[in-house]
Amino acid sequence: MSVADTKKGVEQKMQRSIDAFKSDLAKIRTGRAHTGMLDHVQVDYYGSMVPISQVANMTLVDARTIGVQPWEKPMVAKVEKAIREADLGLNPATSGDQIRVPMPALTEERRRELTKVVKSEGETAKVAIRNLRRDANEALKKLVKDKEISEDDERRASDDVQKLTDKHVAEIDKLVQSKEAEIMTV
């Protein structure tokens, strides 16, 4: 394993951590509707649980309503039930073969709770990034110990890993700030 492999590997892992954090943020409900909120809803499709996106089209009707159109008529009741039981605080309403999912307005107290959740998720993501930095630095130290690289190379590589860490932590901070602003916007 070379220095380049170590740096490339840690950067890929950090990016995956950022992507996982983004998907976690997408699940946190804001006052506005977006189809990504329903991505993790699982529907019973003839005995097996599948994501809602595999049995229905989802569209935005307006800023506060998601329209869900199951591809098969018999699935309407099952999709509605799955949305209701997904613990998102949503109350879908069916009209024919179309399901409308209105977003209830968030209270000020709930908004504050959600910003705390966002900050907590952000801290968890930062810890994951820092753990990746630690692992990379340990791998570099092992390369020095095995006499595969010099201490100067290790120091330069450690600085590069630190720069990657700083870049990804700053990206997490930016994502947290934008999500908080989105939540607090009435």
UniProtKB/Swiss-Prot annotation:
Family from the record: Belongs to the RRF family.
One Gene Ontology term of the molecular function aspect: ribosomal large subunit binding
Compartment list: Cytoplasm
Main subcellular location of this protein, as a coarse class: cytoplasm
Entry GO terms, CC: cytosol
One Pfam family named in its UniProt record: RRF
Biological function: Responsible for the release of ribosomes from messenger RNA at the termination of protein biosynthesis. May increase the efficiency of translation by recycling ribosomes from one round of translation to another.
Entries under PANTHER family matching the protein: MITOCHONDRIAL RIBOSOME RECYCLING FACTOR PSEUDO 1, RIBOSOME RECYCLING FACTOR
UniProt KW keywords: Cytoplasm, Protein biosynthesis
Name of the protein this chain belongs to: Ribosome-recycling factor
Annotated GO biological process: cytoplasmic translational termination
